[in-house]
Amino acid sequence: MSTQFSLSSNISYDDPISFECDTSYDSGLELLKYIIQVTLLSINFILNFLIIRVTMFSKNNDFRENSFFIIYAADLIMGMYMSLSEILVGRLFIYVTLLCPILAPYFFTPSIFLKIFFTLSHYSQGFKTVSQVFLSFNRMTCVVFPVGYSAIWKRILTPIIIVLFVLPIGIIWNVLISRVYANPSFGGFSVNYIKLVSWASLSKLHLTYFIVSLILIIVISGVTLYALLILKHRIKSAEQTLTIATMVLSLEFSFLSVIQIYFAFFSSSTSEWRPFLLRVMYFTYDLLNFSTTIIFISCNPKLRKMLLKRMQSSVTVGRSTSNSTIPVRIIPALIH
């Protein structure tokens, strides 16, 4: 049975919001979609965990004391949260349709659990957006100011970490004061909200962050690439890596911006596109998390060697880090 869902215009904060689950979806097919997505999310979670383990918990201090990897570790931890929360809550509620009639009634009234999940989901998305700018900026300073790089970041790292954690609040502040509720989504249910401040929609706020971040990443990466090109001894592998990383991020941010434009300005008038674009948005966020991790590993032989040795459990991390001839300080300038 396909169901229609709409909210009353005069609903209060505490009123129950009930719905019937859409039983027209094939539960087996939806479960298969869940398994495929969970597989990708799980791989990303494991890779992020391994990177943190071999960089931040190794016997070698090069990674732990490097400003780039400190910022990147925060980015990885946020990526791990995004993957885990989607596996255990977000995608589970949407695609495991047999759970919908069992669990949905528990969320017809205001739920602290849903509010925390929804708020942290959008906070982490905003965090990932902002972190890419600071990682790009770190790479740029390493190339442009090679002598003073360490001293510069010793002074500004703490303020930047604080700003990194504070800026995403600019996306979720309206959610914090608004009603969060469950609504039918595909064969299961997802989480939405009733805006208390009508103009401050999540889609518009995300769109603003995407556009500003995209512009900054392109400008910063352009400066970095130019600085690499004018080096007396050019590092062509670094130039190629930086170009690829910038292109991938730019395409993903541009794609997410287009989707947010739809949700911000056209969703109500062309609702037949909404289910499709929701799926595309979920996939694009997964791809953003996964692609940055893969690019980072594939373009960093030092880290790749450490990960392989860690997984093989054949040598210690400390010994594996001693084989590289490239100073770790240069790594942030070369890859992400």
UniProtKB/Swiss-Prot annotation:
Pfam families: Srg. Belongs to the nematode receptor-like protein srg family. It is found in: Membrane. The gene is srg-13. It comes from the Eukaryota. SUPFAM superfamilies: Family A G protein-coupled receptor-like. It is a multi-pass membrane protein. The chain crosses the membrane at residues 32-52, 68-88, 93-113, 133-153, 156-176, 210-230, 246-266, 277-297. PANTHER family: SERPENTINE RECEPTOR CLASS GAMMA-RELATED (PTHR31627:SF3). This is Serpentine receptor class gamma-13. Gene3D superfamilies: Rhodopsin 7-helix transmembrane proteins. Keywords: Membrane, Transmembrane, Transmembrane helix. GO terms for molecular function: transmembrane signaling receptor activity. One of its GO terms (cellular component) is membrane. One of its GO terms (biological process) is sensory perception of chemical stimulus.
